[in-house]
């Protein structure tokens, strides 16, 4: 199936109709950008683990009906693979770790989707983040001690520890520094803060090297991602979460995102299972009444027993006081 409608674009475009591949290039005084898009038809041979539930193993049905059901519930896996490249110069005033650079935005994704046929475009619901390669290049001579720290974070996550996707520390004394981060997760296109999912933070430590208004370095980044109609459409290669190019091993180091330690907490199994809960996605209403819970939460009957026991103890204490007072 051809994902792309026939239309003219103002940007420089080359298209291989046989392979369903498009390349867009644009270059202005602000910088250079390039985009590569490949349709799913070119990558049918990629092996994927299928999540299926066979209706024939649940219901007894005639062979003819079985075939009709298979056809009725079949779903085409739509995947649009994208590689986006951008380059921009950074003012030394903006290289102090106080600002962030969004590496993928809703506007960019909408631009990619606009090239699809309407019947395909309206099915796209997820973006899968595969890899981000970042190259920093100095705009000054080699040999100047210029340490730099870079972090790629998911700024939607509130915890500063958990938001880290990867961090690197290097030096631009040799003119350039490069590393690659592999996020390897998918998000809904309707998530509220999509632009903050891939946020690049950079801290240039030699802040007195130049004055405000001077461009200190160039950031060039490549983002590989896929737009799909399902969260189950993509499998990722088993790369590390972050890699440092071999040539930069001696002048830099990296920090991977941490995987949490799962606690086997047998004491906290309380969950609200009351009826009349609100529908997922619907506006919630204030619920009046008692909630029913399972787990290690005291039930109403055990509470009543405890109150009865306390009352009994009070009566015994009252009788004891009467004996002491000679009443």
Curated annotation (Swiss-Prot):
GO terms for biological process: transport of virus in host, cell to cell. Homotrimer, through the coiled-coil domain. Interacts with VAP. May interact (via N-terminus) with host prenylated Rab acceptor protein 1D (PRA1D). PANTHER family: CELL-TO-CELL MOVEMENT PROTEIN (PTHR47599:SF3). This is Movement protein. InterPro entries: Caulimoviridae_Movement (IPR051596), Viral_movement (IPR028919). Residues 297-327 form a coiled coil. The keyword Cytoplasm does not apply. GO terms for cellular component: host cell plasmodesma. It comes from Cauliflower mosaic virus (strain D/H). Belongs to the caulimoviridae movement protein family. Its main location: host cell. The keyword Magnesium does not apply. Keywords: Coiled coil, Host cell junction, Host-virus interaction, Transport, Viral movement protein. It comes from the Viruses. It is found in: Host cell junction, Host plasmodesma. Transports viral genome to neighboring plant cells directly through plasmosdesmata, without any budding. The movement protein allows efficient cell to cell propagation, by bypassing the host cell wall barrier. Acts by forming tubules structures that increase the size exclusion limit (SEL) of plasmodesmata, thereby allowing viral ribonucleocapsids to spread directly to neighboring cells.
């Amino acid at each position: 199936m051809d994902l792309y409608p026939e239309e003219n674009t103002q940007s420089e475009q080359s298209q291989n109709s046989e392979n369903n591949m498009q390349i867009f290039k644009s270059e202005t005084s602000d910088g250079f950008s390039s985009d590569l898009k490949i349709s799913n038809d070119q990558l049918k041979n990629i092996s994927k683990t299928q999540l299926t539930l066979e209706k024939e193993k649940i219901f007894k049905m005639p062979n003819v009906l079985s075939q009709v059901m298979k056809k009725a519930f079949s779903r085409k896996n739509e995947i649009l693979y994208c590689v986006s490249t951008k380059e921009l110069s950074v003012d030394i005033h903006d290289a102090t770790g106080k600002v962030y650079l969004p590496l993928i935005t809703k506007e960019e994704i909408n631009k990619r989707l606009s090239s699809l046929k309407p019947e395909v475009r309206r099915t796209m619901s997820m973006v899968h983040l595969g890899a981000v390669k970042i190259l920093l290049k100095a705009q000054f001579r080699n040999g100047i001690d210029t340490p730099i720290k870079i972090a790629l974070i998911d700024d939607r996550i509130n915890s500063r520890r958990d938001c880290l996707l990867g961090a690197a520390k290097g030096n631009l004394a040799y003119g350039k520094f490069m590393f690659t981060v592999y996020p390897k997760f998918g998000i809904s296109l309707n998530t509220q803060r999509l632009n903050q999912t891939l946020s690049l933070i950079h801290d240039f430590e030699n802040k007195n090297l130049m004055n405000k208004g001077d461009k200190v370095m160039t950031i060039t980044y490549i983002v590989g991602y896929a737009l799909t109609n399902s969260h189950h459409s993509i499998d990722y290669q088993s790369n590390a979460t972050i890699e440092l190019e071999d040539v930069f091993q001696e002048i830099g180091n990296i920090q991977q995102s941490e995987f949490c330690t799962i606690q086997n907490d047998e004491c906290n199994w309380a969950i609200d299972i009351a009826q009349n809960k609100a529908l997922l996605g619907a506006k919630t209403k204030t619920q009046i009444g008692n909630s029913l819970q399972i787990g290690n939460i005291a039930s109403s009957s055990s509470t009543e027993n405890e109150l009865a026991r306390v009352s009994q103890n009070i009566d015994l204490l009252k009788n004891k006081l009467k004996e002491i007072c000679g009443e």
